[in-house]
Structure formats: structure tokens, C-alpha cells
Regions:
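Conserved catalytic core of sirtuin-type NAD+-dependent deacylases
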Residues: 1-239
Length: 239
């Protein structure tokens, strides 16, 4: 029997329980920085050393945390379903939890690319993306052809090269699961609209859902607890 397809869209709420700082944390890494200075191309052009230091800190933090029960539960769905994770997060916790098919919409913290390997039409050249693990990159660290390396992150104002791939996954899904991101935040707000009319949508978020849609089941809790409830619900439907 062919496995049902589940598209899982995840945001900051999934990794928050592992201790990953988000924009909205009261005492997170972001508190000491302006978003415009460290997460835009303009900020990079003004002060690349500041941007590199910021992402070096985030990389070091990532090395100290582990996937939580929500990451592990999402990975476990692959036992019975054809699962693709679409994440807005730049950490590697889904990979470390065991998920095998992951689309990183906003890039990956543990990777870098030459700063000139990007254009609005084609995005970045995948063959020039390098995995550096949890190490630092500094001014003067270059590709083989002498170009300064930058974080492999989609900054504010930059195109999201993998959005079309994500849309295809959502359109083909039999079940759409949204965890740790609200429908007020793009691209989640835009992606959910591509689900088929017959596709049930489950949202795990402790906050109210601002959208009224008969397909939506809102599991109002944090990601770890919500994933337990979600698995319980779909297990009963499969009986």
C-alpha cells in the first residue's frame, strides 16, 4: 500500500524547546543586534565582520544543543508515511533527529558560500555551498578563487530559492502539519494555501490561529506536547 504523503512545515517554535534563540526571545542572542545589521545584504556590505561574528555565535550555540522530542517525533513519522520537512529554521536539528528529506527555506547555519554566488533570478549555485560544521568563518576566509565566504543564509530582502520546491510538496501532500510557526508569518501563511481542498491541516502552536478554515485542526500547545497529540490523532484515523 502506498504511503500517505505528509508535508511538515516547521518554524522557530520547534527548536525553541531545544534552547535555540529566536528573534522574539526576551534574552536571546538577537537582543544585542539589530536585524538590519546582521540579517540583510545591506548589513553584510556595511560590516561583514559583525555579521560573521553573529553567525559564529549562533553556530557555537547550535553545537551545544540537541534535538528535542518534537524533532524526534517528526522524524518517526517516516516509519509509516512519506514525509518531507519544510523548515524555516537554519539549524540542523531535524537532520540530527533522523529526518531524511528536508527543505531549508532560509538556508543552513552550518554551511557557507562565496558572497558573489547569488543573483535574484537563479539564487545561489549549489555546487559552491560548503559545509563547515560548527566552526567559525572570519574576514579573509575565502573560496578557492579568492572570494570572501558568507553564511549560507537567506537574509531579509533576498529571494527564497527553494520556495517553488516547497510549494510542490504542499500541493502533493495528503496531510499538512504546521509546527511552531503561525499563519501570520510568511512563508507559512502563503504555503498553506497551496494544500488541496481535501487535505486536512494540523497546526501545533500555543497561540490562537488567526485563520478560519474547516480543514484546520488546531492543537494548542508547544511543539513537544503537540506532536504527541498529533501522532495520537492520526494513529486513531489509521486504525
Amino acid at each position: 500500500m502506498k504511503k500517505q504523503k505528509i508535508a511538515v512545515l516547521t518554524g522557530a517554535g520547534v527548536s525553541a524547546e531545544s534552547g535555540i534563540s529566536t528573534f522574539r526571545d526576551a534574552n536571546g542572542l538577537w537582543d544585542n543586534y539589530n536585524v538590519e545589521d546582521v540579517a540583510t545584504l545591506e548589513g553584510w556590505n556595511r560590516n561583514p565582520a559583525l555579521v560573521l561574528d553573529f553567525y559564529n555565535q549562533r553556530r557555537r550555540q547550535l553545537a551545544t544543543v540537541k534535538p528535542n522530542a518534537a524533532h524526534l517525533a517528526i522524524a518517526s513519522l517516516e516509519d509509516n508515511y512519506d514525509v518531507t520537512v519544510i523548515t524555516q529554521n537554519i539549524d540542523n536539528l531535524h537532520e540530527r533527529a533522523g529526518s531524511t528529506r528536508i527543505i531549508h527555506l532560509h538556508g543552513e547555519l552550518t554551511k557557507v558560500r562565496p558572497e558573489n554566488r547569488y543573483n535574484e533570478r537563479n539564487g545561489f549555485s549549489e555546487d559552491m555551498v560548503f559545509d563547515i560544521g560548527y566552526g567559525d568563518i572570519n574576514l579573509g576566509d575565502t573560496s578557492v578563487d579568492g572570494v570572501q565566504l558568507r553564511p549560507h543564509i537567506v537574509w531579509f530582502g533576498e529571494a527564497v530559492p527553494k520556495i517553488e520546491q516547497a510549494i510542490d510538496v504542499v500541493e502533493a501532500a495528503d496531510i499538512l502539519l504546521i509546527v511552531g510557526t503561525s499563519l501570520q508569518v510568511y512563508p507559512a501563511a502563503g504555503l498553506y494555501a497551496y494544500a488541496k481542498a481535501s487535505t486536512p491541516i494540523y497546526i501545533i502552536d500555543p497561540k490562537d490561529v488567526p485563520v478560519r478554515d474547516g480543514r484546520i485542526t488546531h492543537i494548542k500547545s508547544v511543539a513537544t506536547v503537540g506532536m504527541e497529540k498529533f501522532i495520537e490523532i492520526i494513529s486513531k484515523k489509521d486504525e
